Amino acid sequence: MHRRVSRRGTWSVKAATGVVAFTLATLGLSACAPKPIPSPSPTAVAPTPTAVTPSPQPGRPALHITPPDRWINDPQRPFFRDGQWHLYHLYNADYPDGNGTSWYHLTSTDLVHWRDEGVAIEKYRNGLGDIWTGSAVVDTENTAGYGAGAVLALATQQHDGVQVQSLFHSADGGFTFASADGNPVMPNPGVPDFRDPKVFWDAAHSRWVMALAEGDAIGFYTSPDLRAWTYRSRFTTTGLGVLECPDLFPLAVDDDPGEVVWVLMTGANGAAEGFTTGTAAWLGEWDGEAFTSDGDHQWVDAGPDFYAATTWEDPRVSDAEQLQSRYLIGWMNNWNYATDLPAPDWAGGTLSLVRELALRTVDGQPRLVVQPLGGLDALAPADEGPGADVTVTESWEASDPLPDGAYRLRVTVARDDAHPARETRLLLDAGDGSFITVGYDFAGQRVFVARDTDAIAATMPEDYRAIRSAPLAPDDGAVDLDIIVDDTTVEVFAGGGEATLSSVVHTAPGARGWGAASVAGVTRLLDLRVEPLAAAPVQQP
């Protein structure tokens, strides 16, 4: 982690009594609740953000993918063809009155701006049920007989509770698909869970590899032609519930091509660990037929809303560069309250922003780290130099409101040497006296997000109101926070990506105040920047 040091003068802000948009004294986030914190000082000055074009539809995220209406969930791994990325996600056009999902299609040239291309694989068309998660691939070797470079998709179909795998082919480069003859290519062997095929080409063995979710296990299969599949092995888990949406891929540790580790990733249930549903990952070895883990799983994202995640490489870069990092996207929602969220003209949450996933050595061990996509920088104003420095003794209120629409808040949180704080909190106004908290617990060395006081928390299930946190050691007494906020989401990247927390949130219209609190000591906010992000809503055809 690199601490950003400001060259500007610092602002020393002491607590004072004042009228503010939210009440800091209602917090109590630590295991040992602090005494009530006085209201923030109205005299402090924060960096002044410039104007930004808000999301064109009120209530819609400015940056995140949402469906045109009805219901969205699982993203499908994108592929690159003819200068465009092709992304699909599950979509139910009949929600809430009817069931079943199809594959909805979007395209992009930069993984930031997306164009709506409509439904690509329709549900209930081949007599085998609706369309669930799977994989789109480019068959460069013409293994399936549809021509070199044909776009094909393998996806789970479900009818009367029976899950099978079907093959679909596209004659127009992935915009529409037809069901292949002979479906299903993988009939159900008599098990309740048999779903979400993740397929990739194994060049070393000239065959396709599939990872398939099978209850508490991931099954591995190979095929020469995407039709005939041979079982190879199974990786079984304990205490993580029914697995969904697996992924298998290699990454180089610290960009070293001589130290390549395989990653097995899957949607899982962390309730037995005091967590919630999320994305679990194991590091280990893959020999072409079986995966062997080097240890216990880690959670790719410690927030409550990052599920059904998938990764992919950029085929335009070298093999060595493909091992350095991968793109990552997930579904920002949680089945424990997915249907309870407010649904103005669509439901199901959003897809996360595209991220970059890498392996870095942390405390002597390889660990997955997640960073925002570099392309997001193009949405921010030109760099205006170092940010502001603020000293917070108890509480502080920014005099300038947060930008309309999406924004990015970056800061290094440091403890004062003479009077080190136990905990630091950034409080983002959610309106009507409610707020969202992003903070760091220096005593427990954990970064956390709390939305138990956002605009809808009072009516939501307990799993929504639970405070989520991730372990993160400070670097020389400081922690970097990179926070991206959209109309219904907060994504926190801490410590250079060593900890990530993604949350669906809800605010009242016009809620733009914010401040900070320092518990049991003094906090220094270094190089504090608040940048508006230009709106990039899904472009309609």
Roles of regions detected by a PLM:
Residues 257, 285-295, 300-308, 313-541:
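Beta-rich accessory regions
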Residues 15-18, 57, 479:
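Hydrophobic alpha-helical segments with strong N-terminal bias
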Residues 2-43, 48:
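Secretory targeting and sorting signals
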Residues 28, 33-197, 201-244, 252-302, ...:
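Beta-rich carbohydrate-recognition and catalytic domains
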Residues 19-26, 60, 399, 522, ...:
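Generic N-terminal initiation segments characterized by hydrophobic and/or small/turn-forming residues
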